[in-house]
Each structure stands twice: as structure tokens, then as C-alpha cells.
Amino acid sequence: KNPESVMRSYFNWTEKPPANEMDKWYLPKDEKGKAIGNAYYYGYFSPEMPDWNYDNPQMVEEAKRILKFYIEMGVDGFRLDAAQHIFNDHNKNIGFWNLISAYLKGLNKTVFLVGEVDNSFDVVAPYIKPLDACFDFDLSREVLKILKTEDAATFTNQMEKIVSHYKKANSNYKDVIFLTNHDQNRLMSEVKGNLAKAKQACCILFTLPGIPYIYYGEEIGMKGEKPDEFIREPILFGPEKNDPMRTRWMKPQYNNDKSITPAFLQVNDDQSLLNHYSRMNAIRKNSNALRFGEVASSALNSKNVMAYYRIYNQQRYLILHNVTASPVTLTLDDKDRLLNHIIYQNSKQTIVNANLITLEPYGTLILANDR
């Protein structure tokens, strides 16, 4: 508000906003909410979130000073929100992240930088040169589409495109895989409360290549739909009367003791979503193929079944997900018949004989050539 402030230039100002961006420039307001002055400030997301002016070298140095503070505190990495919106130009953004990455790696060569770039993989790919990883929004959207439509026909093609683009940009790239985040309707709401689909989503997440990220509450089946405050409701650790850790900044619309089983109670239920996440996490943690392996398509992929391999040295896994509400029977070829160790299966899943497999509705099967 103060034109004389030394920090005035930390923000973007103009008296003549561009005609095509009038909805992103705002006049400051006084304590009574009345617009003041004739200079507009820029806020890409909202008037409550003015953008920093990183064309100002002083602002860049201020950001570096803050980052250094946290590095010296022992922070191992940063999640970089809206990494494509530093400037309104992708090349300029990438130049900025090259500068920041070099600075941080100079302070701690193992610092990990993950960028949130909500865009198609061809736009995201250049960002994984300065950054260690980016959230894979395309893969997330593909998985959600499969879960909702029960149609996996396009999965192999989409996965191959994503992997190819990212490898060309950075052969050592690390994918960051997720189901939903703080800007999207929650998974359990997207699948209409279907617990079997929520469990399968977890199986998909933990068997795809990359680093799995879990949005808080996803592991206990929290629900929520836009606007943002309703997809960011307080997590339920225990029953409300015995839950001093539960935050109460708002009255939840979707998540309470009647609609969601709190985490502490799910711990004691072997079939709970939380314990399912724990099991899949343990399987992944103990498998080099799932943690580090390459991904390859399988001829078994179809409308009804997501199918892919995870391969690490001599270790070979075949991952099968029946994405439909009906049983599906598959015929294994001679090569797949050699994968005769079951790493994971749903409780009712049955192998009919040596080369026929029946997957239960929303069932997942992981086969391997060794344990």
C-alpha cells in the first residue's frame, strides 16, 4: 500500500493492466475494504496472493536467503508450489529454477527439489532438467480416468509417451506419482465412496515407477470436493471426544466420525484402507523392482485390465489390475508362466491353472520370477 516502502518493488505494479489480464491485477484496499491508489498489483491466483517480482534481483536474493535459512536448519528438500508461475514464460521459469537449483546444490548437493507443474508432460519435461522431479499430473489424470470409467485401454500408450518425454529431457529423472492433491477433489469422492476402488488406487500408486506421494487423509478414505476448503478438512486421527490433535479451524462438510473411520480405529481393522496402504508400502519397500525398476508394457493390457512389468536387473514383476466390477480371466504366455511367485493378491483371487488367471472385481495380482 505504501509507494515509499523499500519492499514495494518486491511486487509487480502497473497503472495500466494489460487488457487480456485485467482479472489478475488489483488495487490495494484499506482497512474498510475500499480500493486506494491508482497502481495495480499482480496476483495470478487471487488478490489475497500477490505474486513476487522475481525480475527484481533483490527479491531473488531475499528468496535465496530464506532458502538458506531452512537448509541450515536441516531441511533436505523443497516442494515448489506453482513452479510454472514464477513468470508468464516457461523458458524464463526454467532459467530461474536453474539459478535456484545451482544455489541450493551449492549449499547441500543432496537437496531434493520437486516441482508442482500442473500441465501436460511435454510442458513439464523441461522442468525436470533444473529440478530433481515434478509431479506427474498426466499419469494421475490417466489413473483417475481409469478408476472412474473402468476402462484401461489407453493406459499403455499414455504411460509410454510420458516415460519417453521425461527420459529425453533427463535420463536420470525421478517421477513423482500421486493420486490427488490439495487442488483436486479427493479420491474417495471421485470414486463415489467405493472402498474396493480406493484400495486398487493404492495398489496402482505403489506399483508404478516413481516416488509415491500421498495427500494427507487419502490413506483413511477422507472425502471432499471443491471449493478448496472442503478438500483440505482436518484429518481424523481418533474419535473426536478422544482426539486432542484434531484441528478445528472449520466445520467439516465431508469428514466426521460418522462418515469416516478415524485412523486410530482403522489400525485395529486388518481390512481397513489404512492397513492396506501399510501393506502395499511394505511390499514396495522390500522390492527393488518396484522401487527402482524400469516399467514396460504388457500385451495383457486391455479395456478391463491394467497390465505392465517392473524390471530390475534379473528381477521381473508382472502387475495386473482388474479395473472392472466383474471377474476377468487372462491367459498367460510361456514367458509370463515363469513368473510363478505371488507377491500380492486379493483375498478371493484364484489362479485356475498353470496359465489361466482369474482376477476378482477390482482385484490386483503381482507375479514375480523370484521373491
Language-model features: locations:
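Short, acidic/polar
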Residues: 57-71, 198, 202
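Active-site-proximal helices and loops of the catalytic beta/alpha 8
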Residues: 1-17, 66, 76-171, 175, ...
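Beta-strand-rich binding/interaction modules
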Residues: 327-346
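Loop/helix patches that line or flank the sugar-binding groove of alpha-linked glycan CAZymes
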Residues: 107, 181, 186, 192-317, ...
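N-terminal carbohydrate-binding accessory modules
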Residues: 2-40
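The substrate-binding groove and active-site-proximal loops of carbohydrate-active enzymes
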Residues: 45-60, 83-92, 146-150, 185-193
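N-terminal small/glycine-rich loop or linker at the start of catalytic domains
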Residues: 31-55, 178
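C-terminal beta-strand-rich structural cap/linker in extracellular carbohydrate-active enzymes
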Residues: 352-371
